[in-house]
């Protein structure tokens, strides 16, 4: 009995120490500093993917696509013009299976100015560009702390615990660590300012804050499409709070709840009309779906993706898991996620969380913020705006459990506390470790495939007419970035670099004749990615011939999901002639490959990614040791 009392006393002292620290006058600033320090190693991770396109646009004057309505067109990747896309296929920058009308154009003018500042003041310093993003992240943490304190005037500890949960989260790390993803941080800062100003405007007569909320919403939309998630919180606020500064007036539902939203709805409509009129948006890709042009399919995706994103938010299960599953398995996964979330709702209910209007507001707002995110394939990066609400919700749940708040029924206590303990362990133990580890390992994890692989291919100075054929790159769509990466590092590109398949699965290669080879994926699996072509609206057909400059791809067989399983590639000149150089990707990167004789078949086994990763990590350790000597 004394041992149990001692344990309880020790636990109470530890909890009390945490409470005192969270109520310290400098705890908010300390939390912001801690959040930045946890991810500080990313400043050494250099440029990645879109970062190289931004460099090319701002320093070489390159234009990936028309940039009407945008200062530089930094987020204009593919304009959907068939002739332009065919030209990109001819050089290999677009994979052969990409939709001819593939379009990915995003309108983010406010964020573009931040990148222009980077390349104007410190163009040769990716570290300072990362530091710039970290300043936005620190500002977001401080703004969140202020918002929570404004909403939750009854508990300083709970508000700051919410900030602690937010900075420990690994869900938004890619938005912080990737320079090109800064748009999400800028939009989130504007969103938090908008929500806070809207709350002040609706809880006490303050027209100035109303105008501020409207302005911040507009800036959020000009920062990133993710700014649209802000409207979810405003709708939730109107539903939960109405017009609390007029509690004794007989106001209609229209006046209390709907009318305050009209300025924001008007801005959203104007933004969307301008967005469409200027040609922005995405089409032809399986990664993005336009809700306006295909609302039925978007609704179906909400059923699958919303539970998946919420499961990632609460339990930390990677949301990209859904993308790895077959359609039938996706439905089962989403159902299981919904059941797990229902259990969480039940636990929050028995602990009285939903009795708080702030909890209902932030909970509904967090869910609504994820609805527009369901237009894209699931990735944890989409959860940043939802974390605004869920960080506080989790803080309240943890505080209730720590504070010995008694559930409504005693028999609920044990299973509820087990579930809460699991969530606490995920958010305050696992996620901080993931955050620090990924920040430290981001460079060795991403640099090999995004930077080193394209640099391993021969310099065009040696043979400017060479046409490189990459039989099985790890991610074929990354060849879109290869020319910019190589130019950034002072290399000259060859005439073309064509990727034929992804190395997701084992492949077999057959040389059919002097001009033709065939690639076949093992089993019923496909070797293409979903990003470059939406097979629902642009299905493949057996016998379909696709021209990619000097190479013609003919679909021979399809997988059960309608994607190519075997393809014949016919080359404009004999495959043994001088322009063609064949490469395979192995655990050690790209290596030259000698084709078998006509009529023979050979295998291209899928690389062991775990072995490749360990080799990359060891190689990075050696490079760091050499640089320090």
Q: Where do the PLM segments sit?
A:
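Intrinsically disordered, polar/acidic, low-complexity terminal segments
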Residues: 52-58, 71, 77-78, 98, ...
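Polytopic membrane enzymes that build or remodel cell-surface glycoconjugates and lipids
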Residues: 2-486, 551
């Amino acid at each position: 009995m004394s041992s149990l009392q001692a344990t309880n006393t020790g636990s109470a002292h530890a909890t009390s120490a945490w409470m005192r620290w969270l109520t310290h006058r400098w705890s908010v600033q300390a939390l912001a500093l801690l959040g930045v320090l946890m991810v500080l190693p990313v400043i050494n991770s250099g440029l990645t993917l879109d970062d190289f396109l931004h460099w090319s646009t701002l320093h070489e004057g390159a234009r990936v696509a028309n940039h009407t309505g945008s200062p530089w067109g930094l987020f204009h990747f593919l304009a959907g013009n068939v002739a332009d896309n065919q030209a990109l296929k001819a050089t290999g920058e677009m994979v052969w299976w990409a939709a001819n009308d593939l379009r990915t154009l995003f309108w983010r003018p406010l964020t573009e100015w931040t990148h222009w500042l980077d390349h104007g003041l410190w163009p040769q310093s990716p570290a300072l560009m990362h530091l710039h993003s970290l300043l936005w992240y620190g500002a977001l943490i401080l703004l969140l702390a202020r918002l929570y304190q404004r909403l939750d005037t009854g508990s300083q500890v709970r508000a700051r615990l919410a900030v602690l949960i937010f900075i420990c989260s690994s869900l938004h790390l890619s938005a912080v660590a990737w320079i090109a993803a800064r748009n999400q941080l800028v939009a989130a800062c504007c969103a938090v300012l908008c929500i806070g100003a809207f709350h002040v405007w609706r809880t006490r007569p303050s027209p100035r804050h109303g105008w501020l909320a409207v302005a911040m919403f507009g800036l959020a939309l000009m920062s990133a499409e993710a700014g649209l998630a802000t409207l979810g919180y405003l709708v939730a606020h109107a539903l939960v709070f109405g017009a609390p500064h007029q509690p004794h007036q007989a106001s209609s539902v229209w006046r209390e709840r709907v009318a305050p939203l009209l300025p924001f709805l008007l801005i959203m409509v104007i933004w969307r009309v301008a967005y469409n009129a200027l040609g922005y948006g995405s089409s032809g890709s399986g990664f993005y779906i336009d809700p306006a042009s295909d609302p039925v399919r978007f609704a179906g995706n909400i059923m699958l993706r919303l539970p998946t994103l919420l499961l990632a938010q609460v339990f930390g299960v990677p949301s990209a898991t859904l993308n790895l599953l077959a359609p039938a398995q996706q439905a089962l996964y989403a159902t299981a996620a919904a059941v797990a979330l229902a259990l969480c709702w039940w636990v929050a209910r028995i602990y009285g969380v939903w009795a708080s209007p702030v909890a209902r507001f932030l909970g509904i707002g967090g869910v609504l913020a994820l609805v527009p995110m369901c237009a894209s394939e699931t990735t944890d990066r989409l959860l940043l705006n939802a974390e605004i609400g869920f960080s506080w919700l989790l803080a309240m749940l943890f505080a209730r459990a720590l504070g010995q708040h008694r559930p409504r029924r005693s028999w609920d206590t044990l299973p509820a506390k087990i579930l809460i303990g699991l969530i606490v362990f995920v958010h305050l133990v696992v996620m901080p470790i993931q955050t620090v580890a990924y920040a430290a390992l981001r460079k060795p994890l991403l640099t090999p495939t995004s930077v080193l692989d394209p640099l391993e291919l021969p310099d065009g100075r040696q043979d400017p007419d060479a046409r490189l054929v990459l039989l099985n790159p790890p991610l074929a769509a990354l060849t879109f970035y290869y020319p910019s990466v190589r130019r950034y590092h002072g290399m000259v590109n060859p005439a073309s670099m064509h990727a034929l398949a992804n190395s997701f699965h084992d492949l077999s290669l057959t040389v059919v004749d002097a001009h033709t080879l065939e690639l076949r994926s093992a089993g019923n699996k496909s070797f293409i990615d979903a990003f470059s072509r939406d097979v629902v609206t642009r299905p493949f057909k057996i016998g379909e011939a696709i021209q990619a400059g000097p190479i013609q791809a003919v679909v021979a067989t399809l997988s059960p999901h309608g994607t190519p399983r075997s393809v014949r590639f016919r080359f404009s000149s004999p495959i043994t002639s001088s322009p063609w150089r064949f490469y395979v990707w192995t655990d050690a990167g790209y290596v030259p490959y000698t084709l078998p004789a006509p009529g023979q078949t050979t295998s291209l086994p899928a690389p062991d990614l775990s072995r490749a990763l360990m080799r990359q990590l060891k190689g990075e350790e050696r490079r760091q040791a050499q640089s320090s000597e």
